[in-house]
Design a protein with these regions (language model features):
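Motif-centric detector for short Cys/His coordination patterns
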Residues: 1-127, 131
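Active-site environment of non-heme Fe oxygenases that use a 2-His-1-carboxylate facial triad
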Residues: 101, 107-133, 137-143, 148-149, ...
Length: 372
């Protein structure tokens, strides 16, 4: 039950209840502000409602049988509310006008002349300002290359300082990629790797991947990266029905060896509630056989074929040779990666590990706070 008592008194301006449980605030300078009543009660900043030490909420709306306002008042810079039941709240005007959503660098599609940004590994690790710039670039483009990194195994463990803890997956914490006749994955052959992201067979695939080249004496085997989200936005405009199919139809993915198995059945494209792309899950090598009797299978394959043709003929690909001592970092829910054919048997050793995008964004927040 929502009740607002309309009251005028000296020094106060009138507040009128609106439909949908809002109250209209008329500020002395003429600005009007419409505020949800339940929201007002929920965000009361007083120490009885919020833990000052942690800024967590102490009060819970569910403890009130009804919510009603007895009196309200405004000054130039604050709103006062006296709630039925005896509680009072004071809200700074700046708090009521603020967009409280966290602002992060927005992803940007690659320009026609885009090339990955290179940062020095030691500077990235030791210099907070350099790390801040590098992470901002990573959140915009989805790609970062670190140069002059050590070529010792397990160097990727050091990135936890900037990227957060390694995301553990089955198989190996740090994965070794060499040509290996006993390998369980196509990456262990000299074959080219088509565009993909790793572990599509997880319901939540790792969202950041770091690929560290320890040694690269082989010819061929250039690295490839693809701006998957930019491609999908073009596909959404050109083929909206096919795009919707790829958001709706679940696809089975599986990766396994003699000791472990991962399996997920998920759409290739996942959107958030705003319709924005949040995951592009693409791995032709891990995709499993779909049921041909399911009517969705035919429409899925029509859409999948159209998307794949567009991907393989796309100008969204960048090719480069990853040298020993370089680390390629990709936002793997957005950027697909691959590899051209390795032409000879020269020694080539790469290690990769996984991290989480949330933890990278956390590091940006921490670094930005220290440089305000």
């Amino acid at each position: 039950m929502l009740v607002v008592a309309e009251e005028n008194h000296a020094g106060c301006h009138s507040m009128n209840a609106e439909a949908l449980g809002n109250v209209q605030v008329n500020w002395p300078d003429g600005e009007r502000m419409s505020l949800p009543i339940l929201w007002l009660r929920d965000v009361c900043p007083c120490e009885a409602c919020r833990i000052a030490q942690t800024q967590e909420k102490r009060f819970h709306l569910a403890t009130l049988e009804t919510v009603s306002i007895e009196t309200l008042g405004v000054s130039d810079e604050a709103l006062w509310v006296a709630w039925t039941g005896g509680h009072s709240s004071q809200y700074p005007r700046s708090f009521l006008a603020k967009d409280h959503a966290r602002v992060m660098p927005q992803w940007q599609p690659w320009s026609d002349d885009y090339t990955p940004a290179y940062f020095d590994f030691q500077a990235f690790q030791a210099n907070d300002r350099m790390a801040l710039l590098a992470i901002e670039e990573f959140l915009r483009s989805g790609v970062l290359i670190l140069s002059n990194a050590p070529t010792e195994e397990a160097t990727l463990e050091l990135l936890a300082k900037r990227l957060g803890p390694i995301r553990e997956v089955l198989f190996e914490r740090i994965h070794n990629v060499k040509v290996d006749p006993r390998g369980y994955n196509v990456a262990h052959t000299n074959l080219g790797l088509p565009p993909h992201n790793d572990f599509a067979s997880y319901s939540w695939p790792p969202s950041v991947q770091a690929l560290h080249m320890l040694a690269n004496e082989a010819s061929g085997g250039r690295s490839t990266i693809f701006d998957g989200w930019a491609l999908l936005e073009e596909f959404r405009s050109a083929e909206p029905e096919a795009f919707d199919v790829l958001c709706r139809v679940e696809v089975p993915f599986r990766e396994f060896d003699e000791s472990n198995e991962t399996y997920a059945c998920e759409p290739i494209i996942r959107l958030n509630t705003k319709g924005e792309i949040v995951i592009f899950r693409y791995s032709n090598q891990l995709m499993q056989v779909m049921n041909p009797a399911d009517p969705d299978t035919a429409v899925f394959y029509d859409a999948y074929y159209k998307l794949s043709r567009r991907l393989f003929s796309s100008d969204k690909v960048r090719r480069f040779r990853l040298e020993g001592g370089q680390i390629l970092i990709v936002a793997s829910h957005r950027v697909l990666h691959g590899r051209e054919v390795i032409d000879d048997a020269g020694y080539r050793h790469l290690q990769d590990a996984y991290f989480e995008h949330d933890n990278v964004r956390n590091m940006l927040t921490v670094l930005a706070r220290s440089h305000d």
